[in-house]
Amino acid sequence: MDPQTTLSGADKDRLYQAAEMLLEARRTLQPLDDLPATLRPKTLEEAYWVQDVMLEALGTLGGWKVGAPTPEATPLYAPMRLGTFAGSGDRIATQYCRMRGVEAEIAFLMGKDLPPRSTPYTRQEVVEAIASCHPAIELLESALLDPDAADRLTSIADLQSNAGFVPGAAVEGWRNFAFADESAQMKVDGFIRVTGGKNAAGGDLLRLVVWLANDAQGRTGGLRAGQWITTGSWTGKILADSGSVAVARFPRFGEVTVRFG
């Protein structure tokens, strides 16, 4: 948890209760309309604190999801659990799935540590610390019946609906490619659900990674070699069914597949 966040004992009790309600809703596949008003996070910092409590209960950190609604907006981020990662083509057990949401994304694998420091990392330093770039599918589940209708901070606290991560093969020459020139397609069971999708960050995906390395270091403890950073949806949330096969395809970056068994 972020050492810079100071919460009272009463606040911690309230947020622990919120985290437990979200965890129970995910475990039982019995979604909530929202948290009770008395338990909802009141600030973004409180929402992130709930995320950290949920991560502690669910398992080991494998990386971070980070995104922004516009090229100028301050990014939002959430931890991704290593135990929910899968390989392209793998089958996801559906007894733990309710939404079966999928999003096409582009992700980076860190090759070097970027520990916290007072001097901000430059863009070049961050790029040099990245080992590889990959197409990816983020898997989405939620403790909330409709995350878009619930309180915004509750939705953020609920790991921003993250439920898994599926990277594809590494892309050669990615450092010389303009992400703004790329687009994405999502197929489910052979039918194109979205085509021509663009990233909300305006193509500058590396801005998000640089921000994560610098502005979020008090909470993340720095970025570490072996962690994955996925940088937001190109297709929006697409819902699949039990038995579905979802394929995210990028013209330049290739494709990645996930199956719901």
Each language-model region and where it sits:
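Juxtamembrane/interface motifs at transmembrane-helix termini
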Residues: D215, V245-A246
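Conserved, short, structured surface segments that act as functional micro-motifs
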Residues: K237, D241-S242, A248-R249
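A conserved acidic, glycine/proline-rich C-terminal tail/linker
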Residues: L208-I238
